[in-house]
């Protein structure tokens, strides 16, 4: 975004709107999300799937040691695109809020409320001086009371929305196009995982391939109501089916 001298004041100040209604620092935080590894979530009647790509920035990087899918509580997990350090802080906060809710109310926290808690923190960092917005978007998914699958995404601005399927990061646009054409609500959980994998594969450049080290997968199915992560062997077996 090229800015002239008149716009530079709005560019530098997080709490001042530009004449066209923009908060430039929040807009830049969205750019950090777009630069992140491709990440997506899919919700069907059978459950919720979260999937995250992992890329080697250098041949010496051990991607097996990088975590991109996180359990927040027994029934809910999340993933993110953007600044990993920002994501880690928000995930730790979400985990503490979920645990606190269990201790006080003796029941799991609702997924929408947990997402709101995360989003409230993000929103607060868009209107105070001396801080910057969180340069990360989180996709939160799991199974609520009554075996209700839930999938939501929080933006750097603090806004959050429910989705049937959502994709963010470098390949977010291409993955979203694939999901719009191929999404079906009545898929079983394995078919939902395969749909998410194919959406990620649609973002790859010619000659690139997915393997068990370059993707991380988590899911929650309505039958068990719990969030799980696929093992290396399970990821490898699924990739052979594509």
Swiss-Prot record:
The GO cellular component terms are: cytoplasm; proteasome core complex, alpha-subunit complex
Going by the UniProt record, its keywords in alphabetical order are:
Cytoplasm, Proteasome
Q: Which Pfam families match?
A: Proteasome, Proteasome_A_N
Main localization (coarse): cytoplasm
Recorded GO MF terms? threonine-type endopeptidase activity
* Highest taxon, organism lineage: Archaea
From the Swiss-Prot or TrEMBL record, state where the protein is found: Cytoplasm
The UniProt activity regulation field reads: The formation of the proteasomal ATPase PAN-20S proteasome complex, via the docking of the C-termini of PAN into the intersubunit pockets in the alpha-rings, triggers opening of the gate for substrate entry. Interconversion between the open-gate and close-gate conformations leads to a dynamic regulation of the 20S proteasome proteolysis activity.
Any one Gene Ontology biological process term?
ubiquitin-dependent protein catabolic process
This chain's function reads:
Component of the proteasome core, a large protease complex with broad specificity involved in protein degradation.
NCBIfam families (UniProt xref) = arc_protsome_A (TIGR03633), PRK03996.1 (NF003075)
> What quaternary structure, including any partners, is listed in this protein's UniProt entry?
The 20S proteasome core is composed of 14 alpha and 14 beta subunits that assemble into four stacked heptameric rings, resulting in a barrel-shaped structure. The two inner rings, each composed of seven catalytic beta subunits, are sandwiched by two outer rings, each composed of seven alpha subunits. The catalytic chamber with the active sites is on the inside of the barrel. Has a gated structure, the ends of the cylinder being occluded by the N-termini of the alpha-subunits. Is capped at one or both ends by the proteasome regulatory ATPase, PAN.
Family statement: Belongs to the peptidase T1A family.
Q: What is the name attached to this protein's record? A: Proteasome subunit alpha
| Record organism | Sulfolobus acidocaldarius (strain ATCC 33909 / DSM 639 / JCM 8929 / NBRC 15157 / NCIMB 11770)
